[in-house]
C-alpha cells in the first residue's frame, strides 16, 4: 500500500514537471501514476487517499484550464484537458477490475471464507457444494458482489480495540503501530512503529 501509493505520487509529480513543458510523454507517467494509485487502493481501501490526491490535482488543473480555454475558444487544448479526465475515470476502473479478476483467479477454491457470499458466487469456486440448479455468477457479478460484501463488512464493524487510534490521530502518530509479537514462557518480544 505505502510503496504503490508513494510511487504513484512520485510519478504524478514527474508527470506534472514534464507536462509543464508540453511533453506528450507525460501522459505515460500519468497513466502509471493512476495504475499504481489503484494498486494501493486494491491492497486496502484506505489507499484511496493516494488516488484522491491525484484526482483533486487533476480536477483542479482541469477547471483552471477549462476556464482559460473556454474564454479563448482553444478547443485543441481543451481536448487534452478532457483526455486527462477520461484517464482519471477509466484507468483506475480497468486496473481495479483487473486486480480483482486476478484475485478471483488465484483464490478459486471453495473454503470457509466464502460462506458470506451468494450461492451463485460460490458456484464459481472449485470444490463447492452448491446444487446444480444455481447459475454461476459472471465475472462482473462477482466483482460487484465482492466489493459490496467488503463494503458492508467494513461499514458494519462496530468492535473497537483499546489501543485503536482515531482517524485524526494518524498523522500525529499519537499511538504506535504494532507489527510483530513473539513470546515464550519467559520472554516476549514486540516490534512497534513509533513516529518521530
Model-derived segments and spans:
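Hydrophobic alpha-helical membrane-interfacial segments at the cytosolic entry of transmembrane helices
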Residues: 31, 35-36, 51-54, 69-103, ...
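Transmembrane helix irregularities
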Residues: 38-44
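Transmembrane-embedded, aromatic-rich helix segments that form part
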Residues: 2-3, 31-32, 46-64
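Alpha-helical membrane-inserting segments
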Residues: 12, 56-60, 64, 94-102, ...
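Aromatic-rich transmembrane-lumenal/periplasmic boundary elements in polytopic membrane proteins
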Residues: 96-173
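Membrane-interface transmembrane helices that cradle and orient dolichyl/undecaprenyl
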Residues: 8-29, 40, 58-69
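Membrane-interface anchor segments at the N-terminal boundary of transmembrane helices
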Residues: 165, 177-196
